[in-house]
Structure formats: structure tokens, C-alpha cells
């Protein structure tokens, strides 16, 4: 959403600054561009052109948070729990630095990845400490994404 806002909802600009940077064949880049066009339409129709998130993004965070809590409660998901507790100090540190104590943990993780991508796009230097945190958060989110895929495919069994 912020990339769209930064490009003033201009698809030509989004193609130049975002889509063309993907190392993908032209047909995939065209799909990515179409996805951005659809996001622009959603942002306009939902009135979040200046700030805020479209409902789709809010729903994804809600679904991921629900899954996250179920995974933490499940005795079958010790690896997930360990990954979360390994990531937690970075989440706490990020919240303290950003003043985002009220944000859900997963939103803090996504904000960290977003901030990292923005720094990279701006060509700014990234400290080793930040890289360590981003690597751990990325690893944790990758595990959550895999569990989400399993859950959506009916393959995740969390009986307690």
C-alpha cells in the first residue's frame, strides 16, 4: 500500500520502480502489475488512499494471528514454539524502538520486513544487528507461512 502511495497511484511509475525490479519473465511481471492495479482499485474503493490498510490485508493478519495462537497452544508444534521464542526478543526490541507496543506481534514482524525492504530500496546501510533480527524474523514468518499453507490445504493437525 505504501509503495502504491509513494508512486501516487500511477501504474507507469509502479512498473518502473517496483515491477521492473523483479527478476521474472515478462508474463510474470505482467501478473504482478495486474495485482498492483487490483490493489489500487481496492484502496480507492475502501477509502484508504492516504493511510490505513485494505480489508484484505487486515483479514490476512487476523487469520495469521489466529493460526499463530493455535500453533503456540499445540503440543505438536514444539518447533514453531521454539522459533517464536527465538524471535520474541527481536519483536520486543523493535516495539521498544518504534513505540509500537500496542501492535500485534505479527504486525510488528511484517513492519520490520517492510522497513528492511525500504532501507534496501533506498540503498541505506543495514547494521549487522538489524540483519540478524531480520533473518530471524524472516525465518519465523517463513515457518508461519508454511503452517498457513498446510492449514489452508487441510494438512495441519493440531489436536491437543
Task: Kindly give the residue locations of the regions a language model identified.
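Glycine-rich, aromatic-bearing surface loops/beta-hairpins
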Residues: 92-160
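Charge-rich, solvent-exposed alpha-helical interaction surfaces
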Residues: 35-38, 42, 63, 67, ...
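N-terminal interaction modules that seed assembly of large macromolecular complexes
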Residues: 1-50
Amino acid at each position: 500500500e505504501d509503495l502504491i502511495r509513494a508512486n501516487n497511484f500511477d501504474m507507469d511509475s509502479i512498473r518502473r520502480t517496483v515491477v521492473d525490479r523483479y527478476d521474472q519473465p515478462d508474463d510474470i511481471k505482467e501478473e504482478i502489475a495486474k495485482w498492483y492495479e487490483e490493489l489500487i482499485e481496492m484502496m480507492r474503493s475502501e477509502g484508504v488512499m492516504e493511510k490505513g490498510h485494505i480489508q484484505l490485508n487486515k483479514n490476512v493478519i487476523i487469520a495469521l494471528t489466529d493460526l499463530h495462537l493455535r500453533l503456540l497452544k499445540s503440543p505438536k508444534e514444539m518447533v514453531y514454539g521454539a522459533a517464536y521464542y527465538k524471535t520474541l526478543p527481536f519483536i520486543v526490541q523493535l516495539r521498544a524502538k518504534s513505540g509500537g507496543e500496542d501492535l500485534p506481534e505479527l504486525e510488528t514482524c511484517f513492519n520490520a520486513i517492510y522497513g528492511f525492504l525500504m532501507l534496501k530500496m533506498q540503498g541505506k546501510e543495514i547494521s549487522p544487528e538489524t540483519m540478524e533480527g531480520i533473518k530471524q524474523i524472516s525465518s519465523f514468518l517463513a515457518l508461519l507461512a508454511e503452517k498457513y499453507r498446510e492449514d489452508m490445504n487441510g494438512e495441519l493437525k493440531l489436536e491437543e
